[in-house]
Amino acid sequence: MTDITPVQNDVDVNGNNVNDDVSSNLKRPIDQGDPSNGLAEEENPANNQLHLKKARLDGDALTSSPAGLAENGIEGATLAANGENGYNATGSGAEDEQQGLKKEEGGQGTKQEDLDENSKQELPMEVPKEPAPAPPPEPDMNNLPQNPIPKHQQKHALLAIKAVKRLKDARPFLQPVDPVKLDIPFYFNYIKRPMDLSTIERKLNVGAYEVPEQITEDFNLMVNNSIKFNGPNAGISQMARNIQASFEKHMLNMPAKDAPPVIAKGRRSSAQEDAPIVIRRAQTHNGRPKRTIHPPKSKDIYPYESKKPKSKRLQQAMKFCQSVLKELMAKKHASYNYPFLEPVDPVSMNLPTYFDYVKEPMDLGTIAKKLNDWQYQTMEDFERDVRLVFKNCYTFNPDGTIVNMMGHRLEEVFNSKWADRPNLDDYDSDEDSRTQGDYDDYESEYSESDIDETIITNPAIQYLEEQLARMKVELQQLKKQELEKIRKERRLARGSKKRGKRSKGRSGSKNASSKGRRDKKNKLKTVVTYDMKRIITERINDLPTSKLERAIDIIKKSMPNISEDDEVELDLDTLDNHTILTLYNTFFRQYESSSGASNGLDGTSGVTRDASSLSPTSAGSRKRRSKALSQEEQSRQIEKIKNKLAILDSASPLSQNGSPGQIQSAAHNGFSSSSDDDVSSESEEE
């Protein structure tokens, strides 16, 4: 007989406290290193002991007779005692019986019905050596009930399940338990009928429930399985209880079985609202029933119309594309268009390497579907897909093959049709972009030119328009004043330059004089002055014959009343400014500097001024000079100039007819600038 020594309920053999309400976790094994373990460890080397049952024990003693052990659901003479059990198992069965008799005599015996609930303890049991097979999946489609729950109850239960699935605590229960993935191979040894939310939802969809109570039973089964396998105090068990409370709350509003389903009253379509109400009798006078009148469907339910673009230009383009595609798919081309009507199926056609060559497949059927769905925004997009069909054909089928030749033949048909594509520039993209119920689209129907601006009565707009008009007038006035100011400044600048030239005469360095002459020659005159008229009057008779004829032609063009044979009298006051400027800029610009030198402020002649310009005083008065010339240098330069003049006089045709004074004057007038350049250059060299 085994001697059983009672131990305090919350203290183990090592003196450690043990929780009274021990968890029934089915996966917790017995520690093999515990010296108080009474099981034969050599029989269970894999540590596969599990606690399966709880024994009711009191805080002081345990019934020691075999009958008492049987009452507690324990059979056998060997008990396992570890840190979580409330007793130790030692000795023989006879000693246990004697120990129990002594406790009964001392008044310490305890009956089974008086045991406290907090003294529950677990007893070990061996784990199965092989995992149990998985039960058949639910629902069984061959055994569905003939009278499932009504549709309105089914809908309410589905809504309740979907609401529970959205909870955070429902994540572990969404799908069936996978023992392989979760590494729990013996799950089906303890859970004979698994259940989860997706299985309940699937059973609802196929009509596997006859009454709503069966739905609740399956949900409770799922919760109980979790508590049984993980223990009542596990976190996942608490999550199961949370979603159970939420599910029960939803199921409280389950409608009755005979209640009619609630039909949601939708909004009547515009076509139904506009349709007149006509009362019709069931039968006419001859007894024949009338046909039921159904209102037409609303236009907004047609997907084709909703996808139709608002642009009239795009509609015309897609209409032409549809005609081209219809021609390509016509029966008259059936002998060579059939390979391109449908997508290529590499499996049925035994073309396993088709997609290795063709990365973007396309066919005429797909193009037709895209056209019907208005997926093309331009004609170029349609052309690109059609060209892609032929490109794929030529890529996969080499030249000379039958399909390649079919593709070329069909492409010729496409090219001939595509060459007649219309010019869509006449269609405005926003011309027809409106609908009857859309204010913005209706407003775009009218262009800005069709709106009468006189109907605008907003005072702010009118005030801004008045301000804008006044600012435009002020802007024009400011521009005019600025132009007058610029013209006046230019006139003053030209007048000051002329006066400065008259006072300074021909003084100045070579660079300054040459630059001034270059600017005058290159710059055309734009304003008629008195000097221009004087130069034209004095110099026009000195022009060569060819230039004189051209000048006369210019004058005649400005005076259309003069005939070809009439004699032209030059009166500058009768000529317009344009003609005077044309004559001056064409023939007399080069005489401006010489005229200023020949007619100075002192009234002396040009010969006197030219001679004085060659004097030492005149040469020394230049602004830019290296140093004053000596008397010998001045004499030498004068001799050089005289020699040049003599050479020019001897070569000039005027020397035969003109007087010496006239020749000298002409020479001085014609070559004064060159002599000045020589003087200035020599002075700088010195």
From Swiss-Prot:
Biased composition (Acidic residues): 438-447, 675-686
Entry comment on modification after translation: Phosphorylated by the casein kinase CK2 complex.
GO biological process: chromatin remodeling; DNA repair; negative regulation of heterochromatin formation; positive regulation of double-strand break repair via homologous recombination; regulation of DNA-templated transcription; regulation of silent mating-type cassette heterochromatin formation; snRNA transcription; sporulation resulting in formation of a cellular spore
Gene Ontology, cellular component aspect: chromatin; nucleus; Swr1 complex
Gene3D superfamilies to which the protein is assigned, alphabetical: 1.20.1270.220, Bromodomain-like (1.20.920.10)
Keywords, in A-Z order: Bromodomain, Coiled coil, DNA damage, DNA repair, Nucleus, Phosphoprotein, Repeat, Sporulation, Transcription, Transcription regulation
Span list, region Disordered: 1-69, 85-150, 283-304, 424-447, 486-523, 594-636, 649-686
Free-text disruption phenotype from the record: Heterochromatin spreading downstream of the silent mating-type locus HMR.
CDD domains for the chain: Bromo_BDF1_2_I (cd05500), Bromo_BDF1_2_II (cd05499)
Name of the protein in question: Bromodomain-containing factor 1
Organism: Saccharomyces cerevisiae (strain ATCC 204508 / S288c)
